[in-house]
Amino acid sequence: MKKKIFVTGGAGYIGSHVCLELLRENHDVMVYDNLTNSCYEALRRVELITNRKLSFVLGDIKNESDLGDAIYDFKPDSVMHFAGLKAVAQSVLHPLQYYDVNVCGSINLLKAMDKVDCTEIIFSSSATVYGELNDPPFREIMPVNPVSPY
C-alpha cells in the first residue's frame, strides 16, 4: 500500500538509504533536513537511482513553526525520524545543545504529527542507550544505562 512518509534527517547516511528503499517501494517521500551533517547531493543521487522524485524541505526540527507547516502541508501517513545530533563526545561537551535538538526537536515533531492525526513513527535510536555493560545482540526489552547526554 502506497504511503506518504515524512523523513526527518533524510539527507544523512541512514536517512538517504531509507529514502532510497521507500521510493523503490513506490511511497511518496518528503525529506525535512537542515543539512548540518548531510548534503542534498545524497538525495539527488537517490532520485537518479530510483528515477523518482521526492520532496525536500530545508528546515530544522528545533523550529516548531516551520516543522509544523511542512507536516501540515504534506499530511503524512507515517514519520521516520533520523534528525538529531549523534557524537557522544560532543554531547558531553555540549549537553544542552544535544537536549535542545534531540529532545525538544523530537517533541516538536510529535506535536506537529498530533495536529494532523499522524500516529505512526519510527525513531532511529542508538545502541549507546544500553551502556557499556551490555554485550550485543541488544534487544529493546533490555534495561537502559546511558553513559552520555547523547
Residue ranges and their predicted role:
Residues M1-Y150:
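N-terminal Rossmann-like NAD(P)+-binding domain of SDR-like oxidoreductases, especially those catalyzing
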